């Protein structure tokens, strides 16, 4: 066989649903790569003969290989920090109170408007490096800290540039409807007009976004405004998604499902009718335990209902300066289990196959299947559950991206 590389002495957590074992596991396995794709995988005993003198062979020392991790919800590009708001919350101020007093997202908007692209790129690069060291091979990055045309475009340009200069694949999301900017505080409908008539066309003209998102909440955009933005995005051929039911149940998830959104995110206050709507539309539920933890929330998403209705559950970091300044997907695995009561297998699926579904890229990544992109990680663990079980010592030993060893 003519391959570019072969990995032996490994176990595979393929996350392939066609394999009935937990994690889609194949023990005592091997995996071969050719032209950036998975060319063969299976039990080591069935590995076809190949020229060991001409093909690089990597020995996994009994570790586990998983698909590359996918962080499907981040706000990774921003300037400044909000440590002062952290102190205010510890003193009793709520997220909503801080936002309504001019803090929250708006304080980060000011910092991002003042920062240039070079500064934002370097900050983003450092954060992307941190995720990559934990086995992340694909990340979604949202705008939303500009809230004017110039700065929204600036953030999205930086995100696109990061994708060109880093081995991690970057999917971009336009989130101009993240908050009402100060200059439109008494004219939110006017700001929605700006998003639809000026921002969105400018984003499309430069091909800066793969999807469009809206923060549908009582401190941000109502249902009618949300539908206007999402409908305009859909009409332009972009994928849509939604921040919904984080603080209250406004019916955003049902709206997103009706419009064919790829995902709804947060969903702590999602009810059974909303879960059913997601199930019927095939919309993913993105769980963000970092924000739940950092904001000290008490109502968890309806995990049992999501299981009952077969809604794909995704885990993501929601890395951002205000509600989840936690740049770690491995910690999300642990939090997903300890806070939201996911099983370790559900948690890992939420950072691989289901995360790929939320981004519409499941045909190419998210599981170890012949023909898919060779994005995978070797972990120094005895069982896949260890990834969610402990935190603090990074067990990621090797990362292969597009068939190339990028971290060792």
Swiss-Prot record:
Pfam families: Amidohydro_1. Its EC number is 3.5.2.7. Binds 1 zinc or iron ion per subunit. Pathway: Amino-acid degradation; L-histidine degradation into L-glutamate; N-formimidoyl-L-glutamate from L-histidine: step 3/3. It is an enzyme of class 3 (hydrolase). Keywords: Cytoplasm, Histidine metabolism, Hydrolase, Iron, Metal-binding, Zinc. Its main location: cytoplasm. GO terms for cellular component: cytoplasm. GO terms for biological process: L-histidine catabolic process to glutamate and formamide; L-histidine catabolic process to glutamate and formate. One of its GO terms (molecular function) is imidazolonepropionase activity. Fe(3+) binds at residues 73, 75, 243, 318. Its cofactor is Zn(2+); Fe(3+). Catalyzes the hydrolytic cleavage of the carbon-nitrogen bond in imidazolone-5-propanoate to yield N-formimidoyl-L-glutamate. It is the third step in the universal histidine degradation pathway. This is Imidazolonepropionase. It comes from Shewanella baltica (strain OS185).
């Amino acid at each position: 066989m003519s391959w570019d590389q072969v990995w032996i002495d490994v176990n595979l957590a393929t996350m392939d649903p066609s394999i009935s074992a937990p994690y889609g596991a194949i023990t005592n396995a091997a995996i071969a790569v050719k032209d950036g794709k998975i060319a063969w995988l299976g039990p080591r005993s069935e590995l076809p003969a190949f020229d060991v003198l001409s093909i690089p062979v990597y020995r996994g020392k009994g570790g586990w290989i998983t698909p590359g991790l996918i962080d499907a919800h981040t706000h990774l590009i921003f300037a400044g920090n909000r440590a002062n708001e952290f102190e205010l919350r510890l003193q009793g101020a709520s997220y909503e109170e801080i936002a309504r007093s001019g803090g929250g997202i708006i304080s980060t908007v000011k910092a991002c408007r003042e920062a240039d692209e070079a500064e934002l790129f370097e900050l983003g690069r450092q954060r992307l490096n941190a995720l990559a060291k934990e086995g992340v091979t694909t990340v979604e990055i949202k705008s939303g800290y500009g809230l004017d045309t110039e700065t929204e475009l600036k953030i999205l340009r930086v995100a696109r540039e990061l994708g060109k200069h880093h081995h991690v694949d970057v999917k971009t999301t336009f989130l101009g409807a993240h908050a009402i900017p100060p200059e439109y505080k008494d004219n939110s409908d006017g700001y929605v007009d700006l998003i639809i008539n000026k921002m969105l066309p400018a984003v499309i003209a430069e091909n800066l976004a793969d999807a469009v998102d809206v923060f549908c909440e009582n401190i941000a955009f109502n249902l009618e405004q949300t539908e206007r933005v999402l409908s305009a995005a859909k009409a332009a051929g972009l994928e849509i998604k939604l921040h919904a039911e984080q603080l209250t149940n406004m019916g955003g998830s049902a709206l997103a499902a009706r419009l064919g959104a790829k995902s709804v995110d947060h969903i702590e206050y999602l009810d059974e009718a909303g879960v059913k709507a997601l199930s019927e539309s095939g919309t993913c539920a993105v769980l963000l335990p970092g924000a739940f933890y950092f904001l000290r929330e008490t109502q968890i998403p309806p995990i049992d209902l999501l299981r009952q209705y077969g809604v794909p559950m995704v885990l993501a970091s929601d890395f951002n300066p205000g509600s989840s300044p936690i740049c770690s997907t491995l910690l999300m695995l642990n939090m997903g289990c300890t806070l939201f009561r996911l099983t370790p297998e559900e948690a890992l699926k939420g950072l691989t196959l289901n995360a790929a579904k939320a981004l519409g890229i499941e045909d190419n990544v998210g599981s170890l299947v012949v023909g898919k992109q060779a994005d995978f990680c070797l972990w120094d663990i005895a069982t896949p559950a260890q990834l969610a079980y402990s935190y603090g010592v990074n067990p990621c030993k090797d990362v292969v991206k597009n068939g190339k060893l990028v971290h060792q």
